[in-house]
């Protein structure tokens, strides 16, 4: 029986890892592979789209995109993501903190990223064992800014809002934390 009675929830992109170059290159390559003639502006991607659900931002980049094209680009991106993982950077300070609090806190990731991409990056950096629960885009009906993922993590461990803390970098993550009525720490540095 575990003596843990607290939960720390971490976002992945921009919080635990700087993945903007990984995501940018993977999406740009996936779009090119579908023969759609669109170039994503790097600065726009970093400021406006990185960390957001593909269903939210791809239609803003590619006008009149069909559901089939949307899914194809996303599936291609998931499959080529690991080719660019050398561009990812780990937030060493947060990982040191996780190691310090792990005895008293359950540690979870709640992210809009795909399960495959989350597992790829955790394996690349050999840190998967630090996390008790991964909640990815496939595990929720409503991605951030919905609070669904955070609430799911709290319910899974039966931990109250008062004993939960969320680490987020993006505005949509902060909105989700507010909706869940959970205290949060805004992580700066990558975005």
Question: For each of these PLM feature ranges, what is it?
Answer:
Residues 1-6, 115, 120-191:
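Asp-based, Mg2+/Mn2+-dependent phosphohydrolase catalytic module
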Residues 94-123:
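Substrate-recognition element of Asp-dependent hydrolases with the DxDx(T/V) motif
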């Amino acid at each position: 029986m575990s003596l843990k009675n607290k939960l720390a929830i971490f976002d992945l992109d921009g919080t635990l890892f700087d993945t903007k170059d990984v995501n940018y290159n993977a999406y740009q390559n996936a779009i090119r592979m579908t023969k759609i003639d669109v170039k994503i502006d790097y600065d726009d991607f970093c400021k406006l789209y990185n960390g957001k659900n593909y269903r939210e931002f791809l239609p803003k980049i590619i006008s009149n995109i069909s559901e089939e094209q949307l899914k194809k680009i996303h599936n291609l991106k998931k499959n080529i993501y690991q080719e660019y993982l050398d561009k990812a950077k780990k937030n060493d300070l947060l990982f040191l903190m996780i190691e310090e609090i792990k005895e008293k806190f359950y540690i979870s990731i709640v992210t809009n990223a795909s399960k495959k991409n989350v597992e790829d990056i955790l394996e690349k950096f050999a840190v998967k064992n630090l996390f008790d629960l991964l909640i990815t885009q496939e595990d929720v009906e409503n991605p951030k800014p919905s609070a669904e993922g955070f609430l799911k993590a709290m319910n899974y461990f039966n931990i109250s809002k008062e004993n939960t803390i969320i680490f987020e970098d993006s505005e949509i993550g902060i909105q989700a934390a507010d909706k869940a009525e959970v205290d949060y720490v805004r992580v700066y540095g990558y975005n």
